[in-house]
Amino acid sequence: RLRSKGKK
C-alpha cells in the first residue's frame, strides 16, 4: 500500500 502509515 502507498498511503498506509497507520491511519485508516
UniProtKB/Swiss-Prot annotation:
One of its GO terms (cellular component) is extracellular region. It is found in: Secreted. One of its GO terms (molecular function) is toxin activity. This is Venom peptide 7.1. Keywords: Ion channel impairing toxin, Secreted, Toxin, Voltage-gated sodium channel impairing toxin. It comes from the Eukaryota. Expressed by the venom gland. Negative results: has no effect on voltage-gated potassium channels. Has no effect on voltage-gated sodium channels Nav1.2/SCN2A, Nav1.3/SCN3A, Nav1.4/SCN4A and a sodium channel from B.germanica. Belongs to the non-disulfide-bridged peptide (NDBP) superfamily. Short antimicrobial peptide (group 4) family.
